[in-house]
Amino acid sequence: MPAPDAQRLLPLLHHTLGDSILGIYLHGSATLGGLRPHSDIDVLVVVREPTTRAQRHALVQELMKVSGGASRPVELIVVVQGDVRPWRYPPTCDFLYGEWLRADYERGVPPAPEPSPDLAPLLTMVLLANAPLHGPPPAELLDPVPPADLRRAIVTGVPELLTELDSDTRNVLLTLARIWTTLETGAIRSKDAAADWALARLPAEHRPVLAHARAIYLGERDEHWGEDLFTRVRPCADRLIRLIRAIESQTP
């Protein structure tokens, strides 16, 4: 557990959210085989009551000081327990902080509560990781996500994911591999472990692209795609999508 990275968030969260906090949980790469060079610190906060606009503003201002730059990026999500327990789909995300939204934050655009299918796999990972930073085990606060809702959620995000293929190539390819892996096996794996699984099953012509994405993720290669390799990115992504759609079409 990356204690220094995650623990430094606790005073900030307690100061801003106070007694509304029910639990704070580590998840993501830190609990799926360990942090990689490009990994975020992923934290979920479960609260009693919805955050106020003032609290969301304060969270953004404080998180921008400690996330990114010389420190690891932070992805922090707040959910109201009553919005996710009892479980219903799609769940509501009360607050989201991620470095990809920094430009919005700097323009004064605050995150607002909204439905978020992505919470289905996230809450599943939180429950599996069972890594509280504060509060009881997550199973005492969260209901399990039904498998059908998990499958629906991870497929729902594919079209939006594809719009980022040229700008966030590594992450998109690894995420597609993880979606395929999860649909096929029912297990949520780290991105590099999902890539390992997919590489053993992909046609040979698509393996170099995914292998390169995996190597960048692990810090074994620079974030650079040569012209020849980049021309093969779209065909590889299309193949992964066809494999995902094939499983989806067979699911009742």
Model-predicted segments: where are they?
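Helical scaffold of the NTase/Pol beta-like nucleotidyltransferase catalytic core
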Residues: 1-25, 54-56, 248, 252
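Aromatic-acidic/polar surface patches that form glycan- and anion
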Residues: 2, 165-172, 229, 233
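Catalytic metal-binding acidic patch
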Residues: 24-65, 72-80
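Conserved NTP/Mg2+-binding pocket subregion across the NTase superfamily
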Residues: 61-166, 173
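Extended, basic/helix-rich recognition subdomains
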Residues: 155-212
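Structured mid-to-C-terminal alpha-helical surface segments
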Residues: 187-252
